[in-house]
Amino acid sequence: VHSLSLPPEGPTADAALCLRIAGWTGVVEVGDAGLRDSLRRMFSRFVVSPRRQGSEVARLVAVAPAQARPAPVIRELPRVLREEDGALRLAGEDYDATLSADGLQAHVEGQGRFPVETVLKVMLARALARRGGLLVHGVAVAHQGKAALFTGHSGAGKSTLGALWAQAGGQVLSDELVAVWPEPGQGWRAAGTPWNVGQAAEAELSAVGTLAWDVVSRWEPQAAGDVGRMLLVNALLPEATPVGRGGLLGAAGRLLSEVSPVRLVFARDASAAAAIQGALANG
């Protein structure tokens, strides 16, 4: 059993990273200085002062294993076991982790950045799930305070669309993992995350959809079921249990009933950004 409660005075700035991602605040404590510096560079846009956080703060403690295991050539999803008290145990090829039932504490034993990143993603996905939200593999772009989230299979054009939008001067919230959640009385929100291209910013989510290629760019309505199938494939499942799957299905269903389902058919040119700008400006 690991004692993971935060000390009353909070962690010192040089011993921990305090991150704020999509309204979720987490402190990451890493003993290895080199790894801590690497994480600080990676998460630089999302680092905040721990003393200014009035909301609930989660804590992740990462330590080196007693006996190191070799990193695999090809990684698979970790095995997940839910304990009777609701805690989760994750077992990867070269790391192990324990997450408390309330999502506020995690202990990771492993080497390098990957175990820490993996557990952070699970913690964020669980926090979003408690809000009725999702963590989605996709690209989210924003214009005049409104955002559109697009998801799809590998090669669908998510990174390409993000690059085209950035070239047009648009704001890319994220082009790898996008956080979305319902805000009581305010509709859905979309926010960037630190992975790959990501901004510490959020916007009102006004459309969710899929991508397709063509020589002419256009924004068109799409059946919610078609978007839903792709959304479920690309939403990060925080725990592979009936509870986790049920929460994901419920959140996806609500999202598709409250946010416009669309399809962006786009060419690899400036017309893609123009189609998005027009739709979001009039949405």
Spans of features found by a protein language model:
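Hydrophobic positions on the alpha1 helix immediately C-terminal to the Walker A/P-loop
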Residues: L161
